[in-house]
A protein has these predicted regions:
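Amphipathic alpha-helical interaction surfaces in cytosolic regulatory modules
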Residues: 3-25, 29-34, 40-88
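Amphipathic alpha-helical binding modules
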Residues: 89-93
């Protein structure tokens, strides 16, 4: 699971914050050609488009929407249909 140091944080925003979190905790840890799941902490209830584009931008650039639909899954207990939300917001990049 992703570690968000500030447990009081419930919303994630900011392209640079997304990139920083991805670089520190995900990059090099997953094989994008195999199924993988990103787990957000339970308290997170909102992902801003800016955060999504920063965090998932590299994955999206490397494997595209088709690759993400096939291999990517996400667990975010407080966000309804998080995979669709993320993919839809990446289409705006």
């Amino acid at each position: 699971p992703l570690e968000i140091k500030d447990r009081s944080l419930t919303k994630l925003a900011g392209n640079s914050y997304g990139r920083k979190l991805f670089d520190a905790q995900v990059d090099g840890q997953i094989n994008l050609n195999e199924p993988f799941t990103i787990v957000f902490p339970e308290q997170i209830d909102y992902l801003a488009s800016s955060f999504i584009q920063g965090f998932f931008g590299k994955i999206y650039t490397e494997i595209g929407r088709e690759g993400m639909e096939k291999n990517f899954d996400v667990i975010a207990p407080k966000i309804s249909n998080p995979k669709k939300t993320i993919l839809d917001r990446l289409m705006l990049m």
